[in-house]
Amino acid sequence: MRHRVSGRHFGRTANQRKALLRGLLASLIKYERIETTVAKAKAVKELADRLVTFGKKGDLHSRRIALSYLPDRELVKKLFNEIAPRFSDRNGGYVRVIKTGFRIKDSAPKAILEFVDYAKPEKESDKEEKKAN
């Protein structure tokens, strides 16, 4: 029976699970858009929303909490100085999960995890076309 068993375990030990989520969080903050499975995306979404809220507070205690989740101080700086200020007028829902189908090898449901205000970087060819016009 699975009574009172909640949360996502991903078939891993607690340390492995923590390392997985820290890595995904770091990638999300570094690239602002990642592709992963739906279950992992939903788990990281909760943590990312919480971290952006800490980033909006901006005090020392919030920075230290963010350091416990992120492996690199540069990522904490990016979170507090670049990402959190973009969401100053929003009260939650900073990250979205977009389902993209299934992986070919094992049919795992895939998703794109990105910040809500993510803008695709323009390609060089697009920039040249705009200059020509």
Swiss-Prot record:
It comes from the Bacteria. It holds the Pfam family Ribosomal_L17. GO terms for molecular function: structural constituent of ribosome. Coiled coil: none annotated. Keywords: Ribonucleoprotein, Ribosomal protein. Part of the 50S ribosomal subunit. Contacts protein L32. This is Large ribosomal subunit protein bL17. The lineage of its organism: Bacteria, Pseudomonadati, Nitrospirota, Thermodesulfovibrionia, Thermodesulfovibrionales.
